[in-house]
A protein has these predicted regions:
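NAD(P)-dependent Rossmann-like dehydrogenase/reductase catalytic/cofactor-binding core
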Residues: 2, 6-16, 234-319
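Rossmann-fold NAD(P) dinucleotide-binding segment
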Residues: 82-131
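Rossmann-fold dinucleotide-binding core
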Residues: 120-211
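Active-site segments that bind and position negatively charged phosphate/pyrophosphate groups
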Residues: 199, 203-260
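A short helix->loop->beta-strand "cap" motif at the edges of active sites that frequently abuts
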Residues: 52, 113-117, 136-138
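Small-residue helix-packing motif on alpha-helices
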Residues: 65, 85, 101, 236-240
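NAD(P)+-binding Rossmann beta1-loop-alpha1 motif at the extreme N-terminus of oxidoreductases
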Residues: 2-76
């Protein structure tokens, strides 16, 4: 039975689904994984080892095709070009890059879909922002592992798994939730647990985290801290050590393992006092207002629209 997750006030905010909540399997179904980069390789190997009839859909003789052959996938048996893989599959897992998906979908996947098939995504971007509009007679689901493909594979091989978010955008067959939960089980994700969400919430929260915290905010914060010390005359090596190395090598692992309070309880009293005295001075209300502005751009579709247009015009050249 699903385990309820409650906040500090006792309100149920989520339900954790684990192995005992899986009520069906994918026996008799064929799974086509489209793409063989980080997530594609990690996920497909796990599905195959879990006994699911798994095939790959790739560009023939590309680098991913060659890697797949090295990993034991066999041409015309378990390795096909994308259109043929889609024709053979009951479930199609889209794990090529977000930027490449719309063109590949339109040219090679959509013409080969038939009623009752399932499209599975690992990120909600193209569905939520309507870069891909599936027909009404297919299921549209998502399994978003909270870790890169290499870690997904390593955790699976260790007998555990990486947690994942699950969502169903379109349930034509009436079995979309059962099937995506069974797929999560085959990935090992139900061992730590999976959570139900929506395509909207997954992509908007994911983009927000990347931009204001994980990839954008942290990088700029560290950069400003480093520059402040160097501009004040401190040795750049010392500045790097204090502002970058200790964040990733000491503080982040402590916060990951023990939480923010546990991290503060693990550092010196002087460090704790400094954090409490200056943390909000640096990350003040103005910073929060900037974060809200970033979130608004994500929610309105402004960021997605600008990114899609930029990619169509320049590719990765502007990055």
């Amino acid at each position: 039975m699903a385990k309820q997750i409650r906040d500090a006030n006792g309100k149920v905010v989520a339900e954790l689904l684990q192995e005992e909540d899986v009520t069906s399997n994918l026996d008799g179904k064929t799974l086509a994984v489209i793409g063989y980069a980080s997530q594609g390789r990690g996920q497909s190997l796990c599905y195959r080892d879990s006994g699911i009839n798994t095939i790959l859909g790739l560009r023939k003789n590309g680098e991913s095709w060659k890697q797949a052959l090295e990993d034991g996938w066999e041409e015309n048996e378990t390795l096909f070009e994308i259109p043929e893989a889609v024709k053979k599959a009951d479930m199609i897992v889209m794990v090529i890059a977000d930027t490449a998906q719309p063109e590949v979908y339109k040219a090679q996947i959509e013409p080969n879909l038939s009623a009752g098939k399932t499209l599975v995504f690992s990120h909600g971007f193209n569905i939520h922002f309507r870069q891909i509009i599936p027909p009404k007679n297919v299921d549209v689901s998502m399994i978003a592992p909270k870790g890169p493909g290499r870690i997904v594979r390593e955790q699976y091989e260790s007998g555990f798994g990486v947690p994942a978010l699950l969502a169903v955008q379109q349930d034509y067959t009436g079995k979309a939730w059962d099937n995506i939960l069974a797929l999560a089980d085959a990935l090992g994700a139900t061992r730590p647990g999976v959570f139900k969400t929506t395509f909207k919430d997954e992509v908007e929260s994911d983009l927000f985290g990347e931009q204001v915290d994980l990839c954008g905010g942290v990088v700029e914060m560290v950069k400003h801290a480093f520059e402040t010390l160097v501009e004040a005359g401190y040795n750049p090596l010392l500045a790097y050590w204090e502002c970058h190395h200790e964040l990733h090598g000491l503080i982040a692992p402590l916060a990951y393992k023990y939480g923010n309070v546990g991290m503060l309880n693990s550092v010196s009293l002087t460090a704790r006092k400094g954090a409490l005295a200056s943390g909000k001075r640096v990350m003040d209300q103005h910073v929060k207002e900037n974060m809200k502005a970033c979130l608004k751009d994500i929610q309105s579709g402004k960021f997605a629209k600008e990114w899609v247009e930029e990619y169509k015009q320049y590719g990765f050249k502007k990055m």
